[in-house]
């Protein structure tokens, strides 16, 4: 006997057929019943399948040469942060790409020590850096956040691996959605590992279906009732800034990321209501009260836990850029001082 699984009628290309005996190997095909969405990366998405494949190639090659386990996981998360950073004003535009292109050999022989040096610089305050530091390195900001703190074993690169990393740099990461960040990044792992880890991607639509009636709709309704009351607006602002959220099985942080983003959008609406005169604020940093440490999660595996933590920094930065555009002041939280509390 055979079973057919199809997410919706009229979608013949999505139909999966298999024998009942093979059900255990195809149970993921029924993920749509629980709101899980198949990992599909559209070509128009900046973080598209090309990015996932490039990171996957780098992951596979590093693993082949023996760079594996915890060091590899941390290494990849760091690289992806750098790729995101140079396209979103955390770094200067193409700063990471230029460093690789102009400060490392084409054969990749010195890429590993050069990256090691960069990671150390990103974890060192400017005033504590060596006075004779390479000028291109010296321009990188102090990131902190413990992301670059751990000293990892030295990796090893060749010509193809260096080019693969550069191919990742050539992709535009500026529009990356941290909501699919974890799903995309875990796609560098092989399918068998993904199935064992239960690395599902819950669609943004389904996450919103859950959190809106749970608390978001109520908060927006409360805001609508007091948005013209200058006395109650600060009280409401304080209320949402004191909220705490926990996802006890957070995976790569999809729920946490989208929840935080929606709360930051609500905060922007509050600030907009407080600034009806259009005069702006003297210091935007003083009136941004929501931060990533209001979000917490529990995850058994270290890799998705680290991804979730970084994804929270990324969505926070995106929302800070939105604030910057809204009120005409550049606002970025660097060095990183707070983080989502992800326990693994």
Question: PLM features: residue spans?
Answer:
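Nucleic-acid nuclease catalytic cores
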Residues: 1-9, 76
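Preference for the N-terminal adenyl/adenosyl cofactor-binding alpha/beta module
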Residues: 18-262, 294, 298-307, 311, ...
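Flexible phosphate/Mg2+-sensing switch loops adjacent to catalytic phosphate-binding sites
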Residues: 92-99, 222-241, 263-293, 316-337
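Metal-dependent nuclease catalytic cores in nucleic-acid-processing enzymes
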Residues: 1, 311, 315
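Short, conserved active-site loop motifs that form the nucleotide-linked donor/cofactor pocket
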Residues: 340
